[in-house]
Amino acid sequence: MEGYSEANALQFSQEQASSLGWKSYGDPEYVPHVLRYYSVGDSFGRFFGNQQIVAIAKNQLGNEGGQKFWSWWGFTERKEWCACFVSWCAEQAGLLQNGVMPKFAYCPDGVDWFKAHGRWKDGKAVPMTGATIFFDWNGDGISDHVGIVERVENGTVYTVEGNSGDVVRQNGYYIGSDTILGYSSCLLIK
């Protein structure tokens, strides 16, 4: 079991019940109920949400073609899938269900949501682990690509991105690079 999630809490409860010879252990609705009341800026959210979305994203490294992500989103044929990947990871980490992040398949829709919810920082900011990073490859002010911040180290932001050459891979960019449009700040900016 890695990270803290509703699924992991349920698994723990089932293991405890089995080891004790009981039908059930604990309240299966406790974790989802409690998670609804944590604000996105508190230490609980920063630790569990940020680390968890990164761990989920890293577990997908090497996935080619992204069918798992774009079909989860509801598409019946391949589409550009970087935003589907980020949304899928957010859903797996419980961030969609808690209203921390939107489900989006088009990068500008994600940018618009974070801006509308006061959760946007420009590309010169220093992100925290788990932030959503939006890119503008051609300098037109419109996001072309999105990924998840893995970590920041020595002036470089390291990411996990879906649809980076049609695969989930890790990349690195200098903080303040002109190609970084901005970041979500749902949990997430220092």
Predicted feature descriptions by range:
Residues 32, 40, 139, 143-190:
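Aromatic- and glycine-rich peptidoglycan recognition patches
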Residues 25, 76-77, 136-140:
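Short Gly/Pro-enriched turn/cap motifs at secondary-structure boundaries
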Residues 96-166:
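...with weaker cross-activation on analogous glycine-rich loops/strands in unrelated enzymes
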Residues 42-98:
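N-terminal capping segments
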Residues 1-52, 176-190:
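Non-catalytic cell-wall polysaccharide-engagement segments
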Residues 1-2, 34, 55-61, 87, ...:
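Short, functionally critical alpha-helical segments immediately adjacent to catalytic or ligand/cofactor-binding
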Residues 1, 23, 70-81, 120-124:
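A glycine-rich, coil/turn loop motif that links secondary-structure elements
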